[in-house]
Amino acid sequence: MGNDGGSLPTRNELVKEPGKVPPLDIDFKRSVKSSQFSQCAITDEPLYPPIVSCGLGKLYNKASILQMLLDRSSVPKSPSHIKSLKDVVQLQVELDDSGKVLWLCPITRHVMSDTYQFAYIVPCGHVFEYSALKQFGEKMCFQCNQVYEEKDVIPINPNAEQLKTLSKRLLDLALSEKTHSLNKASKKSNKNGDKKRKHVSKSNSKHAKHELRTNRMLDGENVKSETSVTDMERVKRVKI
């Protein structure tokens, strides 16, 4: 090889390395992740207090949730799992000097980013770096001493595996008639039952009126019969 006038193949020609991800794709993914903790999940508007989060760890402006609950048609990306304010928890957030939301962990002093995932505690809503809560021994909020269970630590913008766990938590809460905020779920009014009750009430009312009329008629007949008997006795006495 090489003595016949040909050229030897180089290593790069023989070994194919995996293609590198273009820098633009990396920047795009980072910008998407960044928008998830800086923009409202249903309106894409910048997040501003009061900020709330659902059981799936997404962030919303509370004003947007209120608007959605009043008129779902006004919010194209309306999440079906949010049926009332009980299905969200208001987060305890701080503002920086410029008035923007500051996601700062009081334990690690890290700022929430695509590098540091954050989570919040239900029901108090205090926000921490997720890894710090995992390492924290006591199940008591570092800020307010609220006792909590591990399942009520909600990762913000969860990955696929975390999302499965959160979905199961919501299902378990629904079976126990509770909401994401751990408040009791509102019972839906049974329209058919209400109609039946109204129908029965009307029927009972009609029956009562009919019974009253019947009693009055019977009372009238009794009065007439008593009067006729008295008159007959008077006639007999006169004849005698």
From Swiss-Prot:
Compositionally biased tracts (Basic and acidic residues): 211-224, 231-240
Pfam families in the cross-refs: Rtf2
Keyword hit for Nucleus: yes
Sequence segments annotated as region (Disordered): 1-22, 181-240
Compartment(s) where it occurs, according to its Swiss-Prot or TrEMBL record: Nucleus
Traits of the deletion mutant: Increases intron retention in a subset of pre-mRNAs, including rtf1/Replication termination factor 1. Decreases replication fork arrest at the RTS1 replication fork barrier. Sensitive to methane methylsulfonate. No sensitivity to hydroxyurea.
Spans traversing the lipid bilayer: none
GO cellular component terms, A-Z: nucleus; spliceosomal complex
Biased segments, Basic residues type: 185-210
Keyword terms: mRNA processing, mRNA splicing, Nucleus
Signal peptide as annotated in the record: none
One BP annotation, GO: mRNA splicing, via spliceosome
Record's subunit section: Interacts with pcn1.
Similarity comment text for this entry: Belongs to the rtf2 family.
Known function: Putative splicing factor that is required for the correct splicing of a subset of pre-mRNAs. Required for the correct splicing of rtf1, a replication termination factor that mediates site-specific replication termination at replication barrier RTS1.
Protein name: Splicing factor rtf2
Originating gene: rtf2
